[in-house]
């Protein structure tokens, strides 16, 4: 996971929100460890001043998947970078396409958050 440039590791939800809100760009995104579910990650996306959080996890067979909007077919990927590439396209079951990566090395000093909305959808490995 450390090879994924948007992976920020064990940062808090609040810190992730600050990093995204500091960009001010809809479609900004990052990946962080889930604070509530061990072994699960959160794909956090900025859209219209709110942060949407989608849970990402790895199955026992090594495939990666993200829980998306109800009714959207669940897709599995060999690598996290493939999952991210798929969600850069429109109509993939998340609020907006992933457009602006917030890389760990380029994280700036964040501003205070103005709002938050968690989809907080959880996907656990079977």
UniProtKB/Swiss-Prot annotation:
Residues covered by the SH2 domain: 6-102
Compartment(s): Cytoplasm
InterPro entries for the chain: SH2, SH2_dom_sf, SH2_prot_1A, SH2D1A_SH2
Modified residues (N6-acetyllysine): 89
Residue ranges of the region described as Disordered: 100-126
GO cellular component: cytoplasm
Keywords: Acetylation, Adaptive immunity, Cytoplasm, Immunity, Innate immunity, Phosphoprotein, SH2 domain
Database matches in PROSITE patterns: SH2
Modification sites for Phosphoserine: 119
Gene Ontology BP terms: adaptive immune response; cell-cell signaling; cellular defense response; humoral immune response; natural killer cell activation; natural killer cell mediated cytotoxicity; negative regulation of T cell receptor signaling pathway; positive regulation of natural killer cell mediated cytotoxicity
One family name in Pfam for this protein: SH2
SUPFAM superfamilies in alphabetical order: SH2 domain
Biased composition (Basic and acidic residues): 115-126
Interaction with FYN SH3 domain: annotated segments: 67-92
GO MF entries: protein-macromolecule adaptor activity
Oligomer and partners: Interacts with CD84, CD244, LY9, SLAMF1 and FYN. Interacts with NTRK1, NTRK2 and NTRK3.
Function statement: Cytoplasmic adapter regulating receptors of the signaling lymphocytic activation molecule (SLAM) family such as SLAMF1, CD244, LY9, CD84, SLAMF6 and SLAMF7. In SLAM signaling seems to cooperate with SH2D1B/EAT-2. Initially it has been proposed that association with SLAMF1 prevents SLAMF1 binding to inhibitory effectors including INPP5D/SHIP1 and PTPN11/SHP-2. However, by simultaneous interactions, recruits FYN which subsequently phosphorylates and activates SLAMF1. Positively regulates CD244/2B4- and CD84-mediated natural killer (NK) cell functions.
Protein name per the record: SH2 domain-containing protein 1A
Taxonomic source organism: Rattus norvegicus
């Amino acid at each position: 996971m450390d090879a994924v440039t948007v992976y920020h590791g064990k940062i808090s939800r609040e810190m992730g929100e600050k990093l995204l809100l500091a960009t001010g760009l809809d479609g900004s995104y990052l990946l962080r460890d889930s604070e509530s579910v061990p072994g699960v990650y959160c794909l956090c996306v900025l859209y219209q001043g709110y942060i949407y959080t989608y849970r990402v996890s790895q199955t026992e067979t090594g495939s990666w998947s993200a829980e998306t909007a109800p009714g959207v077919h669940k897709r599995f990927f060999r690598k996290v970078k493939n999952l991210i590439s798929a969600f850069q396209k429109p109509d993939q079951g998340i609020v907006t396409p992933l457009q602006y990566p917030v890389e760990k090395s380029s994280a700036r000093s964040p501003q205070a958050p103005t709002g938050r909305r968690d989809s907080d959808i959880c996907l656990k490995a079977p």
